[in-house]
């Protein structure tokens, strides 16, 4: 277990985690103008001018290893509207909580500006297979038919959360991976926020002398600590950060730190309690 440098992960890591979860995202594309456009098979077709911008939903975002470039899954019709040579676009990702009673709450916003490009159909299928090894997702099953993979060459990243607005350099995103517990966080929030589980109320006593009127909510778990939402008797809500004594790298270490925050022993007698 390595020492904890700060109470929260770095901005680039928080942004990387939000992109991997991709709870709710849209891609803002400029409307096509009259002329021709490229298609995923390399041919060209005539287009009619239209007004307004297209904002297709993004079903998945995957960062290419070692770079800040992103592969995005969007509807085929919207991908076909991207001209040859690409077009500047904006990806907006709402990092919504995916588990527990706070499901659907937005905790941060990630905005990525860059050049979005088409990928030919054959390369899309190969890329989808490669992505599935790292990020299995049902959104990849439709690639090549009702959905398409496009590439976003990242130029600028903005992260907005409780810490304020942070401008993240593409190189920082390229060298930062998501939190190691990103994929499982939603399941743990479901379990730990269960009314039958008393772990969250015990943690809440570390930041308030008595329990608030409403049951405290665990709204975030990462390698560096947990986030709680507390509501007082007047209905005012506030968020509290409880950092771990040491950063976690695997599930066993995370279970240890969660128990210590709740006032438990480092090594429980019940082996089942080793799990978060």
Q: Which residues does each predicted region cover?
A:
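Binding-site signature for planar aromatic cofactors or substrates
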Residues: 1-276
